[in-house]
Amino acid sequence: MVNSCCGSVCSDQGCGQDLCQETCCCPSCCQTTCCRTTCYRPSYSVSCCCRPQCCQSVCCQPTCCRPSCCVSSCCKPQCCQSVCCQPTCCHPSCCISSCCRPSCCVSSCCKPQCCQSVCCQPNCCRPSCSISSCCRPSCCESSCCRPCCCLRPVCGRVSCHTTCYRPACVISTCPRPVCCASSCC
């Protein structure tokens, strides 16, 4: 298997086998549509070889599926789902239907709870910040979320205050604003 990819005469026989070595890559094993000139397909984790996820018809580039999906010379397949691809975050949880949520990405790490339903917050990634399908940015303090911000100040009406209600201010599902003075309840 190894020898079939090596030598002065290259053959497609054995190309893509996991036994092929880096020095055995040859142009005859390549597909010109998406692979580099010195790689074979389907490939494995050999540096000079094409990654199979880079050779999808919907997102074919010289080096990998989509340029923004590339970290150094390695392609992350989870970046290239359906029609969405993120430049800084490559976790599948960042994709909802066909829409990527860049604001769900903190540095190089994705927080999936940012991408619930149709809401996504840049600063806060806790599920407790969500009421129905609406995120509440005012519920977020630094990296911590205060769920008590997201109560219903008027019974039957969904809203959120910039100040934080304390659980003690709540009767049933309706907080009592008069209970809250400054930051103390």
UniProtKB/Swiss-Prot annotation:
Sequence repeats lie at residues 14-18, 19-23, 24-28, 39-43, 44-48, 49-53, 54-58, 59-63, 64-68, 69-73, 74-78, 79-83, 84-88, 89-93, 94-98, 99-103, 104-108, 109-113, 114-118, 119-123, 124-128, 134-138, 139-143, 144-148, 149-164. Disulfide bonds: none annotated. In the hair cortex, hair keratin intermediate filaments are embedded in an interfilamentous matrix, consisting of hair keratin-associated proteins (KRTAP), which are essential for the formation of a rigid and resistant hair shaft through their extensive disulfide bond cross-linking with abundant cysteine residues of hair keratins. The matrix proteins include the high-sulfur and high-glycine-tyrosine keratins. It comes from Homo sapiens. PANTHER family: KERATIN ASSOCIATED PROTEIN (PTHR23262), KERATIN-ASSOCIATED PROTEIN 4-11-RELATED (PTHR23262:SF183). The keyword Aminoacyl-tRNA synthetase does not apply. The keyword Phosphoprotein does not apply. Transmembrane segments: none annotated. One of its GO terms (biological process) is hair cycle. The lineage of its organism: Eukaryota, Metazoa, Chordata, Craniata, Vertebrata. Belongs to the KRTAP type 4 family. Residues 14-164 are annotated as: 25 X 5 AA repeats of C-C-[IKRQVHEC]-[SPRT]-[STCVQPR]. GO terms for cellular component: cytosol; keratin filament. Interacts with hair keratins. Expressed in the hair follicles. It comes from the Eukaryota. Keywords: Keratin, Repeat. The gene is KRTAP4-8. This is Keratin-associated protein 4-8.
